[in-house]
Design a protein with these regions (language model features):
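Hydrophobic, small-residue-rich transmembrane alpha-helices and their short perimembrane loops
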Residues: 1-76
Length: 76
C-alpha cells in the first residue's frame, strides 16, 4: 500500500472515530438540557447558556480530529 493511500485511509478513520464521541456527547447534552428546561422553565436561560458552552467544548474535539485528518492528508 502506498503511503498516500494509507494517509487517506487514516484521515478517514480519524474523522469517523473522532466525530462519534462529540456527536453522542452533544445529543446527551441537549437531551438533558431539554429535560431540565421542562422541569424548571424559569431557569431556561441559565440552562441554555450552559448547554451552548458544553456544545462548544464537545465540538472542539471534533475540530481537533479534523486538524489531525488535514495533517495526515497534506503532510504525510
Amino acid at each position: 500500500m502506498e503511503p498516500k493511500v494509507a494517509a487517506l485511509i487514516a484521515a478517514g478513520f480519524a474523522m469517523g472515530i473522532g466525530s462519534i464521541g462529540p456527536a453522542v456527547a452533544i445529543g446527551n447534552l441537549v437531551g438533558k438540557a431539554l429535560e431540565g428546561i421542562a422541569r424548571q422553565p424559569e431557569a431556561s436561560g441559565d440552562i441554555r447558556n450552559a448547554m451552548f458552552i458544553g456544545i462548544a467544548f464537545a465540538e472542539a474535539i471534533a475540530l481537533y480530529a479534523l486538524v489531525v485528518a488535514f495533517l495526515l492528508i497534506f503532510v504525510a
